[in-house]
Structures are given as structure tokens and as C-alpha cells.
Design a protein with these regions (language model features):
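Canonical positions in the second alpha-helix
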Residues: 20, 52-53, 111
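"A position-specific structural signal for the A-helix of alpha-solenoid helical repeats
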Residues: 33, 66, 86, 90-94, ...
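Short coil turns that delineate tetratricopeptide repeat
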Residues: 24-25, 58, 116-118
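TPR-adjacent "capping" and linker segments in tetratricopeptide-repeat scaffold/adaptor proteins
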Residues: 18-23, 70-87
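Residue-level signature for tetratricopeptide repeat
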Residues: 3, 20, 35-37, 94-98, ...
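Terminal, low-structured helical/coil segments at or just beyond the last alpha-helical repeat
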Residues: 129-152
């Protein structure tokens, strides 16, 4: 399941994780991986699954990514906020919720380029969480890791 996750094969990973969790519901590693891969579809449930996990180590980093993305997916920028950064963040949230991770990366990067301090600098955390979400060895992670490093 982890190998599928790392390479961005979400469906295959979720199928394996579901079977693992049916047999062993206390498997924290599988639970965190499952939460990470389902946070776009069910942010509140995903956040609940990782609620008691400290942000330390590999599992902790994934749990923190779930918390960041859960909050991000529920973000609603005030419609009176007309800044370019706000428009990009809103587009990124909509893309993420729709499963369009590449578009979410693009819009988040643009929001960061326009205003590095928008949302009190949380865009950095969102970009890092999107990298973790996409799978560390996936094509998307490779592509956007380089671009993110160039704008930071």
C-alpha cells in the first residue's frame, strides 16, 4: 500500500489499505495513510483519524499533512477579498476538493508567488502538504518539488 502511495497510485493504495484496516483496525500507519489519501473527499473524517498523532517522524509528518489539508479544503476566502492571491487560493481549494491535484499545486504556487504572506504564510504549509499528499515518488511530486523550490 505504501509503495502505491509513494508512486501516486491512489486507488490501488486505498484498496490495499481498506483490506489491511479490515483485518487490523489498530494499524496506525495504515490508518494515517488512509486518512492522507481520503482527506480531499472527507476532510473532517480524515482529520479525526489523525487527531491524536504527534507531528514526529514519517507517520507524524503524514498526520500533519492531513491536518493542514483538512483545514485547507474547508477554506473559504471572504468573497469581499479581491486580491489575486485570494483568487488563486479559492481556485486551489476547489481543484483539491475535485481531485485535481495538479491544478491545486499550480494555483497554490501562483498564490505564493503573488503574496508570500497571504493567509499568514500558510501557503508554504499547504504546498508541503500537497507534496506529501501526492506521493513522494509520484510524477506530480517530482514536477512540483522543483517548481516549489524555485519560488521559495
Amino acid at each position: 500500500a505504501e509503495n502505491f502511495y509513494r508512486t501516486g497510485q491512489r486507488e490501488e493504495s486505498l484498496q490495499k489499505l481498506s483490506r489491511i484496516l479490515e483485518r487490523n483496525p489498530d494499524n496506525r500507519r495504515a490508518e494515517v495513510l488512509y486518512a492522507l489519501q481520503t482527506v480531499a473527499q472527507n476532510p473532517a473524517k480524515a482529520k479525526e483519524l489523525v487527531n491524536n498523532i504527534e507531528p514526529v517522524g514519517f507517520i507524524g509528518e503524514m498526520a500533519e499533512a492531513v491536518r493542514v489539508l483538512s483545514q485547507f479544503s474547508q477554506t473559504r476566502i471572504n468573497s469581499e477579498e479581491k486580491s489575486e492571491a485570494a483568487q488563486h487560493v479559492n481556485a486551489s481549494v476547489m481543484a483539491f476538493r475535485s481531485g485535481l491535484v495538479e491544478k491545486a499545486f499550480q494555483e497554490s504556487i501562483e498564490a505564493f508567488r503573488v503574496d508570500k504572506d497571504f493567509m499568514d504564510g500558510k501557503i508554504r504549509q499547504i504546498l508541503a502538504a500537497l507534496l506529501i499528499y501526492s506521493g513522494e515518488e509520484s510524477r506530480l511530486a517530482e514536477k512540483y518539488r522543483k517548481e516549489i523550490l524555485s519560488v521559495l
